Amino acid sequence: MDENKIIEVAHLKYEYPQASRLALNDLSVSINAGEWVAIIGHNGSGKSTFAKSLNGLLDLQSGDITIDGLPLSIETVWDIRRKIGMVFQNPDNQFVGATVEDDVAFGLENQGIERTEMQRRVQDAVDRVGMTQFMTREPSRLSGGQKQRVALAGIIAQQPEILILDEATSMLDPKGRQEVLETIHTLKQETNMTVLSITHDIDEAASADRIVMLDKGQVIDQGTPAEIFAYGQRLLDLGLDVPYPEKLKAALTKLGVPMPVDYLTTERMVDHLWTLHSKM
């Protein structure tokens, strides 16, 4: 295995009972240590199935998965699960503690972590996600964004090498989504954790180092956000959205305004339009 590759999957196949086609159809991809990769695709493209396969939640028909040098098997599955932390769509389904502090500590108690070390990890985790002042609060009384930050703290406390976000921001309002993404950005900068984001949210995908596109259980393309977003119409054809600057660029092009062919972020779009205006 390439020492830079923390996740390597090859020729994965999986079919749900009574399904008309494979959910994963000869899927192969690799992810570097410390990389943030967004997996995008329409509903039914295989995104969540792929995520669940990585820590042995599914019994694959065929294929190989290697996590940090360990081939996934019955013998290694628990070692691999300790390397991976998952945050799901609905944080309420992950809460077990009566307070934020209890909930963040729960996974550590199951691992038999010594009490002093457990207290240190819990405090560090809630500090990192900006929830220190809510330590004694009931999770059910928090906002959506706050709940996901607590769920994230519970994962951080366990110190995994890989963080998987399985549609973790899809049920949040824009403010809550931004809170969670900013928290992950900060965490990534401080720890260099590998992040795998399963999403159909283009703004979330834009935060990644690389985007992998799935369709019908297969990887159909991958590249930087700028490379993928430049496809424009192809994303729409796959049932995905395109960033607002790309929509604006298409509309301006139809009006005859000269626009570059590559993807423009909001900042670059403003700079480009300002340059055009100054030349008028």
UniProtKB/Swiss-Prot annotation:
Enzyme class: translocase
InterPro entries per the UniProt record, alphabetical: AAA+_ATPase (IPR003593), ABC_transporter-like_ATP-bd (IPR003439), ABC_transporter-like_CS (IPR017871), ABC_transpr_CbiO/EcfA_su (IPR015856), ECF_ABC_transporter_ATP-bd (IPR050095), EcfA_1 (IPR030947), P-loop_NTPase (IPR027417)
Bilayer topology annotation: Peripheral membrane protein
One of the record's GO cellular component terms: ATP-binding cassette (ABC) transporter complex
Primary location group: membrane
Cell compartments where the protein resides: Cell membrane
Tagged with keyword ATP-binding: yes
The name this protein goes by in its record: Energy-coupling factor transporter ATP-binding protein EcfA1
Organism of provenance: Latilactobacillus sakei subsp. sakei (strain 23K)
Gene name per UniProt: ecfA1
